[in-house]
Amino acid sequence: MSAAGIQKRITPARISAMKGGKPIVCLTAYTTPMARLLDEHCDLLLVGDSLGMVLYGMETTIGVTLDMMIAHGKAVMRGVGKACVVVDMPFGSYQESKEIAFRNAVRILQETGCDAVKLEGGEEMAETIAFLTKRGIPVMGHIGLMPQQVQTAGGYRSVGHSEHETSKIRRDAHAVGGSGAFAVVIEGTVEPLAREVTSAVHVPTIGIGASSACDGQVLVSDDILGLFNDFTPRFVKRYDELGKRISAAAAAYADEVRSRQFPAAEHTFKRRS
C-alpha cells in the first residue's frame, strides 16, 4: 500500500477522537471480497476471532490460532482503502505475559499491515495493554461478555445484572481506558450500565449487545446478512437473508444443470473460422 493510501485510511487516533461525536460504525470482515464491500461504509473493520465459529464451524473462539488471525488479517487488508482495521488477538496469544503479548502483537501488525490489535480483559489485562501501547502498538480493549472466557463464565450470557458484575465492569472500563487503549468494546452488558460506562470513560465505547448510547456499534457481518444461522443473538438485527438467497440461487443452478438448460449457447465457446 502506498503512503498516500495509508494517509487516507482512518487511524486509531482518529477513532479515539470520535468520542462523544458521530457514532462509530464497525463490522467484522474475514476475507478480501467482504472487506471491499464493507470498507466504504465503515469506520472500523474488525478481523474478529468470531471467524472460528462463522467460517470454520467451531463451537467457540477458543480453537482460533494466531496463524489463522494473521492469514485473515492479510486478506482483509488487501480489500481496504479507508477503514481502520483491527485484528483480534486469539486465546492464548497474550494472557501468559505482557512480553509474549508484545511479540504476538508485533507479528500481527508486521505480517498483516493492520492498524491495531484487540484483546479481551479488564483490570487483569491493563498492565499488558499499557505495555503494548507504550511500545507503539495501538490496542482496543474488550470488556463485559468476553467470548474467550465463556468456558469459565458459564456460557454466553449477558452481564451486569448483579452488584458484583456491575462493580467489575466499572473497574474494568476505567482500567482499560486508563491503560492507553484507544477504544473499548462493551459486549453483552445491560443497557443502563453500558450507558453509564460510556459517560464515565474518556475513550470511545463500541457496543455489541450493550446500548445505543455507546460511541459506536459493532456486529458480526454474517449475522446481519443472514449468512450464519447456527444461532442468532438477541442483539442482532437481520438486514438481509443472503443465506436463503444463496440457497435459492444454488437450487436454480442445480435444476438448470440437471435439465441441461445450462450452459446455454451464450455460455459456450464456438470454434474460430
Curated annotation (Swiss-Prot):
One of its GO terms (molecular function) is magnesium ion binding. Binds 1 Mg(2+) ion per subunit. Mg(2+) binds at D49, D88, E120. Its main location: cytoplasm. The keyword S-adenosyl-L-methionine does not apply. The active site is at E187 (proton acceptor). It is found in: Cytoplasm. Its cofactor is Mg(2+). Keywords: Cytoplasm, Magnesium, Metal-binding, Pantothenate biosynthesis, Plasmid, Transferase. It comes from the Bacteria. Catalyzes the reversible reaction in which hydroxymethyl group from 5,10-methylenetetrahydrofolate is transferred onto alpha-ketoisovalerate to form ketopantoate. Homodecamer; pentamer of dimers. This is 3-methyl-2-oxobutanoate hydroxymethyltransferase.
